[in-house]
């Protein structure tokens, strides 16, 4: 069984493309069930964040599985495959494992070392577990990824010099305005990113913070935590003129602020500049807002320059983290190999033993005047011959590396001897220790 990854990220696709294939976190059941319904796809997890959309799956048909998932992404989101495909990457085997371990450890993030991605993958895995699209392989795979991320955070200092996307957004605001003590901030959304942004804005000494969310109770809760002012979402347009800085991070599937809204907002502000930071994917703010005089709109893709701080120190720590990832890949594949190899060895020995016993029984039943103890000796002799014959193929199977060669050996044995490999036992499925 092969693990495959198909996806795109901030490295391969601009936000205009990423938002086209983003999945709403509250509506994961339908796409997860659709992926595992694809031919030869047995398990699936979907990860959808502001910086990446990835599907992790298991299949015996690597090329076919990747092609079907690419087609699924295009068809599900009504995006032409030829437009999407040039932004997609795909991995299998060790490359897939390395990629996911690196993503979970924040080595592939826009902000290397940021902690948010691990929580986002855990949430994605939670949906897959809830809707039963993940099984024994992806369950173990992602638990191992979480373990790798924990090792990276505890054994390196990669997180100590990292900045979050929210922090980068605040730093960008400081670069635009300089002094923020006379500025009022409006946060649209009440999730983790807005919570982090609230913390950073408060620390910079802004004049005030307002929070709005479709669920007013969540806005109230976040506002209370930071001594901010909660605002009903229905009052968004009336509230905008009071804000100098607007940071938006909701899960809305469409724009919540449009170009046509801004003329009246700016008139009421006497055309004082407004700074918009849209870190939502799909985007919350119509990009045409940037065409309005005195409106300055930035997206998550504009934060790259800010996150370059402390880059050299993070490179040193990232090298240590990469070594941990490589070490853990070997451990995981040792476990994954056992899922294929152990049941095949058991089936092979059972197959030979059944033949041995059948032939021995025929021989003994046609042998008159069998000396006392001969049956026992013949049984031992034939068993020893069988063990000698099976020793070499068994040893080879146990020591070869997991990968394409392993699949070839296992498949060849199963086909040559028409082996029926049943469900793996719990002993064979024992997880590696974290």
Curated annotation (Swiss-Prot):
EC number(s) from the headed UniProt entry: 1.2.1.70
Active site: 50
GO MF terms held by the record: glutamyl-tRNA reductase activity; NADP binding
Stored CDD domains: NAD_bind_Glutamyl_tRNA_reduct (cd05213)
Protein task: Catalyzes the NADPH-dependent reduction of glutamyl-tRNA(Glu) to glutamate 1-semialdehyde (GSA).
More about this protein: During catalysis, the active site Cys acts as a nucleophile attacking the alpha-carbonyl group of tRNA-bound glutamate with the formation of a thioester intermediate between enzyme and glutamate, and the concomitant release of tRNA(Glu). The thioester intermediate is finally reduced by direct hydride transfer from NADPH, to form the product GSA.
Name of the protein: Glutamyl-tRNA reductase
Protein source organism: Citrifermentans bemidjiense (strain ATCC BAA-1014 / DSM 16622 / JCM 12645 / Bem) (Geobacter bemidjiensis)
């Amino acid at each position: 069984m092969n693990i495959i990854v198909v996806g795109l990220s901030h490295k391969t696709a601009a936000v205009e493309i990423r938002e086209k294939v983003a999945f709403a976190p509250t509506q994961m059941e339908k796409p997860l069930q659709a992926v595992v319904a694809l031919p030869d796809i047995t398990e699936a997890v979907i990860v959808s964040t502001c910086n990446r959309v990835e599907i992790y799956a298991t299949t015996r048909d690597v090329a076919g599985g990747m092609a079907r998932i690419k087609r699924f992404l295009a068809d599900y989101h009504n995006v032409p495959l030829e437009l999407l495909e040039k932004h997609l990457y795909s991995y299998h085997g060790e490359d897939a494992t390395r990629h996911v371990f690196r993503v979970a450890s924040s080595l592939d993030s826009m902000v290397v070392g940021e902690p948010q991605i691990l929580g986002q993958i855990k949430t994605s895995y939670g949906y897959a577990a809830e809707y039963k699209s993940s099984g024994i392989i992806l369950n173990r795979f992602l638990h191992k990824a979480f373990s790798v991320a924990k090792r990276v955070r505890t054994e390196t200092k990669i997180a100590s010099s990292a900045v979050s996307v929210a922090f980068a957004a605040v730093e960008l605001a400081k670069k635009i305005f300089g002094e923020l003590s006379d500025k009022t901030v409006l946060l649209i959304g009440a999730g983790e990113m807005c919570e982090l942004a609230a913390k950073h804005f408060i620390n910079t000494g802004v004049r005030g913070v307002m929070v709005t969310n479709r669920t007013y109770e969540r806005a109230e809760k976040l506002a209370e935590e930071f001594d901010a002012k909660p605002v009903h979402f229905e009052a968004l347009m009336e509230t905008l003129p009071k804000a100098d800085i607007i940071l938006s991070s909701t899960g809305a599937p469409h724009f919540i602020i449009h170009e046509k809204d801004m003329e009246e907002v700016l008139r009421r502000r006497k055309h004082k500049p407004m700074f918009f930071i849209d870190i939502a994917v799909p985007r919350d703010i119509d990009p045409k807002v940037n065409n309005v005089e005195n409106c300055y709109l930035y997206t998550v893709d504009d934060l790259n320059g800010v996150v370059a701080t402390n880059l050299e120190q993070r490179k040193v720590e990232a090298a240590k983290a990469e070594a941990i990832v490589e070490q853990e890949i070997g451990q995981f594949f040792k476990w994954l190999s056992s899922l294929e190899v152990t049941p095949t060895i058991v089936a092979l020995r059972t197959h030979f033993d059944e033949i041995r016993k059948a032939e021995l029984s025929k021989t003994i039943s046609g042998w008159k005047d069998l000396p006392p103890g001969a049956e026992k000796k013949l049984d031992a002799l034939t068993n020893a011959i069988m063990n000698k014959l099976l020793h070499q193929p068994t040893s080879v199977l146990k020591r070869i590396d997991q990968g394409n060669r392993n699949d070839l050996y296992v498949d060849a044995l199963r086909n040559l001897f028409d082996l029926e490999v049943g469900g793996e036992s719990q002993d064979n499925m024992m997880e590696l220790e974290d």
